[in-house]
From Swiss-Prot:
Organism: Borrelia duttonii (strain Ly)
Protein name: Small ribosomal subunit protein bS6
Biological role: Binds together with bS18 to 16S ribosomal RNA.
Domain of life: Bacteria
NCBIfam families given in the database record: S6
Start and end residues of each stretch annotated as Disordered: 113-134
InterPro entries hit by this protein: Ribosomal_bS6, Ribosomal_bS6_sf, Ribosomal_S6_plastid/chlpt, Transl_elong_EF1B/ribsomal_bS6
HAMAP family, alphabetized: Ribosomal_bS6
GO molecular function, one term: rRNA binding
Keywords, ordered alphabetically: Ribonucleoprotein, Ribosomal protein, RNA-binding, rRNA-binding
Swiss-Prot/TrEMBL GO biological process terms: translation
Bias-annotated ranges (Basic and acidic residues): 113-122
Amino acid sequence: MIKKYEGCFLFRSEELEYKSALEEVKKQLVAFGAVDFVENSIGERALEYPVRKQLRGRYEIIEFKMASDNLRELEAQLKLIKNLLRYMILVKINRKVSVKKVKRRNFREYRDNRDIKEKEQPSESNVDADLKVN
């Protein structure tokens, strides 16, 4: 069955190593039947902890469609790519949002904001009482 996947890949930060590893990942994806690529480069970031003695890495997100039967073989091949530090492949789920839930949520936000505004504004009776006392 063909499913839509989203893969987050962490590469070494050096330009040449990054580009070669990214091309290798794309070749493996194509070899296992992935189609409809959408790439999004997040860029170079400092890592929270060292990964394979690297303190910085480049992130790349690739969305693709592929048969679910090939996923295990793909992951086995991705583990062999030298400059790929980490990867995570998730099934992308498109959820439908019902109109009733949106309307209900908007009403709740409106109601909550209205209550907050009423608490922030002093009531007229309190203002009149303060004036009479002075």
